[in-house]
Amino acid sequence: TYVQKIVSQLKGKIKLNSAISNVFRNNGKCIIEMNKKKLKFDFVFFACHADQALKLIKNPNLLEKNILGSFKYSSNKAVLHQDINLMPKNKSIWSAWNYIIKNKSTSKASVTYNMNILQSITPKHDLLVSLNSDHDINPKAILKSMIYTHPKFNLNTYLNQKKQHLICKNGFAFCGAYWGNGFHEDGVVSALNAIKYSGINP
């Protein structure tokens, strides 16, 4: 996982699986309230969803409220399965991303990712991930079900995506896929930008 990869390269002391209740600024330092203890740091990077970061900050300033508060999220059920009935009938047009719309006027698109193509893996069986389509999947073909939250984008979020530099200061910096198009790569780019905007030299 990402965490395991990062942990393997860090030399400092790391705390995992720790419940953080509040983060706030105090006399030029950043205080994290964690497991009923107060820990002092020079800088805090919020590598999480925008709404989660906003909930963690005890007294967010106006810019943080307005910018982070503009990002909204939706919950989606993702199912890892092997039911090819959710893929196009013509296998020659299978793609990394596929969708089916049963009724153009009323139905939402059923999105299915072909993990074999997306991750360049060649298992014996097709590995598929479908969003919000569990009722269409053969229960016997389901391998695992998960609930994820994804950012919802509109004109307001697009405008606020250009303001990351305005809130990566005064001890706090914010990174996450919401600064881009919601992909893993966007999260990495936003982290590099957060470091640059905060003026920290890693």
Regions found by a protein language model. Give the residues of each.
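Short, hydrophobic alpha-helical segments
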Residues: 10, 14, 42, 198-202
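C-terminal catalytic lobe of FAD-dependent flavoproteins
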Residues: 136-202
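Mid-domain catalytic core of redox enzymes
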Residues: 12, 18-152
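Short beta-strand to alpha-helix junction loop
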Residues: 1-7, 15
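A short acidic-Thr-Gly-centered motif at the start of a beta-strand
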Residues: 6, 35-37, 164-168
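A short helix-to-beta-strand connector/capping loop
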Residues: 8-13, 168-171
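Residue-level signal for well-ordered alpha-helical scaffold segments within enzymatic catalytic domains
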Residues: 5-8, 55, 59, 193, ...
